[in-house]
């Protein structure tokens, strides 16, 4: 750390900004272009808000109504590349926790990656991402995730798609015949119900793969704020009196053909809870003939909707990258039935500390990483991302994609067993 808002660049691929000695350096390739002499990588301050907002407008058309355009606070790390006093590129690293294999995995949620129009095609996006990943590792993140806008760039940086956040619409007629089931009672949520809602979500996250935990500073909401963020939250109460599911929803404006009833979360621990919450959404059909839902992964909602007409209106691809191989493999949970040793070799230019030979020992739902011999499989950083996320990806598929080479049939069998499990999902856009 050079000062309160200055940090050194990290690693051999920090081509811009400060050298490892902490002194600012020139980039001869940029000098030759005549457009840029030197850039500095540092954290953003409130004084940078105008430049950051201008860049966001250029890149994404924001600010979006109802969302803060520039926030600083616990759990949010904003970084920039500066050409003198001019902000040339920026990123945001949000402190998240992903749940993989039932265990928490510290995550850098990357967003707002942008380069000013006057500084594009100079490699600044790659440079700032490389430095941001190094800083994320320094604060303890072991994986990084993002919603892609430039797939070629992010794949070249070692990210690979593991999930999709899908927004879909369907006519209420597709829900015809659904009723609140006798074993379920619906009621409106109050602030006191927020812990039960969080418990429902966390159980589903533990049973899934890659969902965010919705804990930590970036999800710091009071019980009242959690419930009041929507027009309504409806609970599905089971026979024992437990909260078996909930739906958070917004009624929308007006009524008639163009009115839409939007469901943000529709989560249930039982089929009765899910079906009953769908029936609640259908009950608005006289005034809102269209229902909008958000889903991801193997959502049982798909299997409980009786009619036709489901149309995906927005699909956001979710990518993952392994930032710290050893810690990422050791933090996540693995199938309890998997036991064995896998020798893995990795070449990682963006996160060079991952490069090397690794011996992964699986036992009892956990894994340990030790120095390896190089006698097993070779895996690319993108292959490593898919390996860590799991979800039934197979070694054969990784080989066809050029992400896996070498090793033996026994290695492939062990890989397939380790990668078995729930399909990755994500329900939070950032």
Language model: regions and residue ranges:
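Intrinsically disordered, low-complexity, positively biased terminal segments
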Residues: 29, 34-37, 45, 183-430
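Short amphipathic alpha-helix that is part of the acyltransferase structural core
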Residues: 28-95, 100-109, 175-220, 257-261
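A structural microfeature
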Residues: 88-89, 163, 244-245
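Aromatic (phenylalanine/tyrosine) cluster motif
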Residues: 10-16
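GNAT/GCN5-related N-acetyltransferase fold signature
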Residues: 81, 92-93, 115, 236, ...
């Amino acid at each position: 750390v050079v000062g309160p808002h200055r940090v050194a660049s990290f690693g051999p691929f920090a081509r811009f900004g400060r050298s490892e000695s902490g002194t600012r350096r020139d980039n001869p390739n940029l000098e030759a272009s005549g457009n840029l002499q030197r850039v500095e990588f540092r954290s953003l301050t409130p004084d940078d808000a105008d430049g950051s907002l201008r860049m966001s407008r250029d890149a994404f058309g924001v600010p979006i109504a109802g969302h803060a355009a520039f926030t600083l606070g616990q759990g949010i790390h904003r970084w920039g590349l500066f050409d003198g006093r001019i902000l040339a590129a920026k990123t945001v690293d949000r402190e998240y926790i992903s749940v993989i294999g039932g265990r928490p995995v510290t995550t850098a949620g990357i967003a707002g990656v942008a380069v000013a129009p006057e500084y594009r095609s100079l490699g600044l996006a790659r440079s700032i991402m490389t430095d941001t990943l190094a800083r994320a590792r320094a604060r303890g993140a072991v994986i990084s995730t993002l919603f892609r806008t430039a797939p070629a760039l992010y794949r070249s940086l070692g990210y690979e798609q593991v999930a999709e956040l899908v927004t879909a619409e369907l006519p209420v007629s597709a829900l015809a015949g659904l009723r609140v089931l006798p074993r379920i009672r619906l009621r409106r949520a109050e602030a006191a119900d927020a812990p039960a809602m969080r418990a429902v979500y966390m159980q589903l996250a533990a049973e899934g793969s890659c969902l965010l935990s919705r804990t930590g500073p970036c999800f710091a909401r009071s019980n009242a704020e959690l419930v009041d963020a929507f027009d309504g939250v409806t609970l599905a109460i089971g026979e024992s009196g437990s909260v078996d599911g909930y739906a958070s929803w917004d009624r929308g404006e007006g009524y008639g053909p163009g009115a839409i009833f939007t469901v943000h979360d529709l989560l249930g621990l039982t089929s009765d809870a899910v079906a009953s919450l769908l029936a609640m959404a259908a009950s608005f059909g006289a005034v809102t003939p269209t229902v909008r839902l958000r889903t991801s992964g193997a959502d049982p909602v798909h299997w409980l909707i009786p009619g036709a007409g489901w149309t995906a209106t927005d699909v956001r691809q979710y990518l993952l990258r392994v930032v710290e191989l050893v810690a990422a493999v050791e933090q996540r949970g693995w199938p309890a039935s998997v036991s064995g040793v896998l020798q893995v070799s990795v070449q990682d230019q963006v996160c060079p500390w991952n490069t090397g030979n690794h011996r992964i020992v699986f036992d009892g739902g956990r894994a340990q990483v030790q120095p390896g011999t190089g006698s097993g499989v070779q895996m690319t950083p993108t292959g490593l991302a898919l390996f860590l996320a799991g979800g039934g990806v197979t070694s054969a598929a990784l080989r066809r994609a050029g992400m896996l080479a070498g090793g033996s049939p026994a290695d492939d069998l062990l890989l397939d067993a380790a990668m078995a499990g729930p399909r990755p999902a994500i329900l939070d856009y950032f």
